[in-house]
Structure formats: structure tokens, C-alpha cells
């Protein structure tokens, strides 16, 4: 297994390459770590490889907030600097600067 360099960091605001949602990264898996049922539910034309980083997001779209699990290949930087309006933001992060949220320093 080779060492992978993450394209994104915890706290980065990102958007999905194919679907209309954005979010902030709060955790990362170094390879696919979800159910096969979830994986097969992704349309084949955008189904990601399993051998890459997957990010946990506090996500939002125009209608709802939710948690998302997205492969690195399907994420782009969101340069809008607009805050994420997810209700769990303040439980995980203590502030925001530009397009990045930061965790509290202990």
C-alpha cells in the first residue's frame, strides 16, 4: 500500500464535482470505508475508485443539510468563502477564515 497525499484538509470547504452540494471536511478515510450497498447506489458514470481518499462532510444544498461521504476525485475547492449552514458546524469547529474552518486549540 502506498502513502497517499491528501488534496484536501480537515476544515476545507469543498463542492461536489457532479452534484449540487458543498460542505466542510470533518474527517478522512485513507481508502473506501462504507457499505457495498452504498457504493453500488452511486450511478456508474460517477462511481469512484475505492483505492483513494474519502472525505466525511457536513454538507448542504439549497434545501437541506446532511452528512456526506465523498471520494477525493469527486471534490473541488469551493472558493466562494460562503459559510456552511450545517447545524453541527459549531460542535466541531470554532471559527472560519476564508474558505477554511478551524478546530478549537486545546
Question: PLM features: residue spans?
Answer:
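Intrinsically disordered, low-complexity boundary segments flanking structured domains
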Residues: 12, 41-46
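Mixed-charge, Lys/Arg-rich low-complexity intrinsically disordered regions
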Residues: 1-13, 18-22, 29-32, 103-106
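Short, solvent-exposed secondary-structure boundary/capping segments
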Residues: 32-41
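Intrinsically disordered, low-complexity, charged/polar segments
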Residues: 47-106
